[in-house]
Design a protein with these regions (language model features):
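Rossmann-like AdoMet
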Residues: 1-28
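S-adenosylmethionine/decaboxylated-SAM
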Residues: 22-275
């Protein structure tokens, strides 16, 4: 762990520009920082974006992992870095030796992210921890989606906030994203139907349906097939069921974690998606 980050974690304090100690009352926990580093090391993003900086704790975790990627760049935006955080976050990053890989902009995220889309910038990773209001988070994620390459990861902090949870649900239900952590797990019922589908593909159930019992079994078989489609096919559920009735567990969202990671599966067609 970088010495600057290690000092903050061990003392719970940050150092202001004039050398005084200040209680570190904002920032991510160590488990979330290690989760970020695990994601970064697994996917090795070359260009990443961070919304919000404050004291730079999340940025320190990210940059420590990014240092392992050649020619990596981390774009940070925080309109309150000097007015509220007294420049501590950027100072920490410079003291830690990451000045060469960060690009800081003291602009609102909705303005600078829009500028990046106009410049056709592409990114591989994003961390959203700015304004937690639903509209701000939604706009941040919407613009980041335009920048994010398929396979890229978006991590959102403070997932326990209803506003952030609802934004995640929207993107999982309406765009091509899946939840990849933490505590990702399959529904037991879904796993059962997937095992059944595997048996069908292997031909172990087919002969039974061709036997004299076929007439009795077919109605139940149709119910099994449709039940499997209902559980396995997200597009089918979108047509057949209200989105509000899809549970967090079905979307693989964690119950109690304070952060969540979504992976972009592919680019969505803006024209056809609107119909």
């Amino acid at each position: 762990m970088n010495q600057v980050l290690q000092s903050i974690v061990s003392t719970g304090s940050v150092v202001t520009e004039d050398g005084t100690l200040r209680t570190c009352d904002v920032g991510i926990a160590q488990d979330e920082g290690e989760f970020l580093q695990e994601i970064m090391r697994r996917h090795r993003p070359e260009v990443s974006v961070e919304v919000g900086c404050a004291y730079g704790i999340s940025s320190l975790y990210i940059c420590e992992a990014l240092r392992e990627v050649n020619a990596a760049k981390h774009i940070i935006m925080d309109p309150y870095q000097h007015s509220w955080s007294q420049g501590i976050g950027i100072a920490n990053l410079k003291r830690a030796g990451y000045a060469d890989i960060i690009e800081f902009h003291e602009d609102p995220s909705y303005q600078y992210l829009a500028r990046l889309t106009e410049e056709h910038v592409k990114i591989d990773f994003a961390f959203i921890d700015g304004n937690h209001s639903f509209d701000y988070v939604l706009v941040d994620f919407f613009l980041i989606d335009k920048l994010l390459e398929p396979g890229g990861i978006v991590v959102l902090d403070d997932f326990s906030y209803p506003s952030i949870r609802n934004v995640c649900r929207y993107f999982l239900l309406n765009l091509s994203y899946k939840c990849v952590g933490p505590q990702s797990r399959k529904l037991p019922e879904l796993a059962q139907w997937q095992r059944l589908a595997s048996r069908v593909r292997q031909g172990t159930i087919g002969p039974l349906l061709k036997s004299p019992w076929r007439r009795m079994l077919m109605p139940a078989w149709r119910m099994i097939v449709w039940r499997g489609v209902w559980l396995v096919s997200t597009p089918m559920r979108r047509f057949l069921v209200s989105r509000n009735s899809v549970t967090d567990a079905e979307l693989n969202l964690p119950n109690s974690a304070n952060y969540v990671a979504l992976q972009k599966l592919r680019d969505d067609d803006d024209v056809t998606r609107g119909f």
